[in-house]
Amino acid sequence: MILILLKRLFGKAGCRRTSKKSLLQRNSFIIHAKGTSMARAHAEDLPWTAQNSPKGKYSLARRSLSMAAGGQKDIGTWGGGHPFDLEIHRIPPGKINFPQHEHSAQWEAYYILSGSGQVRGPKGKEAIKAGDYLVFPPGEAHQLINNGSEDLTYLVIADQPQADVIYYPDSGKWLVKPQRKCFEMNEADYFKGEE
């Protein structure tokens, strides 16, 4: 398997002239994996952690498989965490997962495990159901709405960029990760407070 990867990365000639060990030492993205071992978590062993907005419009419960397997919240390989985050989310009937938001750097993928509802995206609201796979690239606002009669459960896979700025178009708020600081932006002169 390693030889196949090396051939894809460097071509057959590069593999014949250079040892596998020296190639591994020269390529930092491969070195990150070197010396690590498999991490494991079982979803059914994890408690559901509830997250509700003060007035109850937004509500979900989550199981963080990545955190249970040794990952760090919003921290990728650049900070000693995992390269992606994996969670299971469950939205009760009549609730919404999060305020509509768009990431500047992070990709998110959702796989609907059970239930039905709507995704609110660039085309407005569209019906979703078990078996649907949704991919949200950076810059695309999205949210899930459970307008069904049972829980809407889905798998979330997200990469872990070193920094991500999240915009909430309905309220004009911003959030910066990994610091998780939320703010409203006010226009200011570039040199204000600098001299």
Which residues fall in each region the model found?
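Short acidic-glycine-tyrosine-enriched beta hairpin
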Residues: 123-138
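Polybasic, lysine-rich low-complexity intrinsically disordered segments
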Residues: 7, 21-22, 27
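Glycine- and acidic-residue-biased ligand/ion/polar-headgroup-sensing regions
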Residues: 107, 111-117
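Conserved short histidine dyad/triad with adjacent acidic residue
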Residues: 69-73, 87-103
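A short, N-terminal "cap"/entry segment at the start of jelly-roll beta-barrel domains
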Residues: 26-83, 169-195
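Ligand-binding loop in jelly-roll beta-barrel domains
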Residues: 118, 138-164
